[in-house]
Amino acid sequence: MEHILEKAKKIKALALDGDGVIFTGHVIEGVDGPLAKMRCHADGQGISLLRAAGIVIACVTGESGKNAAFLERLVEKWNNLPSVAEGRWKPITVFTGTERKRKVEVVESWLKEYGLTLEECAAMGDDMTDYDVLQTVGLAAAPAQAEDIIKKHVHFVAPRSGGHGAIRDLANLILEAQGVDVTKLSLR
């Protein structure tokens, strides 16, 4: 655990997958496509805590078009919080249509915009489309329900599943390692 905390101390950025991490991975399908996806407010609170502590966030998904609309709408909501409008938090960046091999390239390019390195980035993913990026970041994480092949190759496996608090588990780890008193953070 000490090794993981040392890695978490260095984190200044977080890249998240969509389905299976932000959302549960379950989709209610309708005649014209997906109708609903589920997520957990604890994860949203974890993201707010990280942003309040100065950590920049990106969502990187292979989905595009109508399938990515759920994630795009959620991030738009998060980016309309008063803390973003007032300039206290950086907006969350969304990358859609990003296939497995391109995720590393996209994350690297995004980090350069902030003058950050892969070593200063954490990422959370749940399946093979996330494997490459998880192998390159400073702190690789997976939700509890991630595929075994992913869990074998990450530094931290959250106790909770994707869409059920896994992001909050990772946020708590990072903030604790960095000695952040979450009771002192401005969350709106």
Located regions from the model:
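A generic local structural motif
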Residues: 1-3, 42-45, 108-109, 126-129
